[in-house]
Amino acid sequence: MKITFLGHAVFLIETNKKILIDPFITGNPAFPKDFSFDKIDYILVTHGHGDHIGDTVELSKKYNATVVSNFEICNYLQKKGVNKVHPMHIGGSFNFDFGKLKMTPALHGSGIIEGDNIIYGGNPGGFVIYSEKSVYHAGDTGLTKDMELLRGVDVAILPIGGNFVMDVEDALKAVEMIKPKVVIPMHYNTWDIISADEEKFKKGSKQLGVKCIILKPGESVEI
């Protein structure tokens, strides 16, 4: 399994399929400018905020990708001309051709902003991909005891930037609860308001006996 970080909360997971998570490409100052997609099979959207739903409509149409998100976001995307959607909700799981996918709770918002309006975007969530390895992408979230139920996943991708999501201290509490084999930080240093010290997070993870891999935008790791 190959995991590529594309800045902010954007990740490309490659198994037998190519799975793109939270495709915030346009306007993302951390997206690697020389990166391009050759294929996208699935797009997972954790919630409706613009820095996560991002370019979902355009990419889904271009690559004929199936979008997986909560029911409300899938309904919204269908009205935007996205034909291939798979709605889920928190606690639900489904067996896809890449493996099993489970939607997990997240403590955040999910409103979709269009002009002066905020469209209800359902409940925010995260995803666990059970394929060659198990990968938990937390989405945007504060710390929650529900994370204990994910104990033992191979990889946990956690936000550490604070303000809107967990800060480093809370993210380390999440690491302690989940005890993944590997943790990868995300959602930090895109803008000043979510600045964080990733090396402090790495050091704290090591003290908890968990390997932390810090990826720069465009970098990949084989798990």
Swiss-Prot record:
Q: Which molecular function terms from Gene Ontology are attached?
A: hydrolase activity
* Superkingdom field: Bacteria
Q: Does the keyword Chaperone apply?
A: no
InterPro entries associated with the record: Metallo-B-lactamas, RibonucZ/Hydroxyglut_hydro, UPF0173, UPF0173_UPF0282_UlaG_hydrolase
Q: Which UniProt keywords apply?
A: Hydrolase
The family line of this record is: Belongs to the UPF0173 family.
| Organism from which the protein derives | Thermosipho africanus (strain TCF52B)
Q: Which Gene3D superfamilies match?
A: Ribonuclease Z/Hydroxyacylglutathione hydrolase-like
Name this protein carries in UniProt: UPF0173 metal-dependent hydrolase THA_544
Q: Pfam families from the xrefs?
A: Lactamase_B_2 (PF12706)
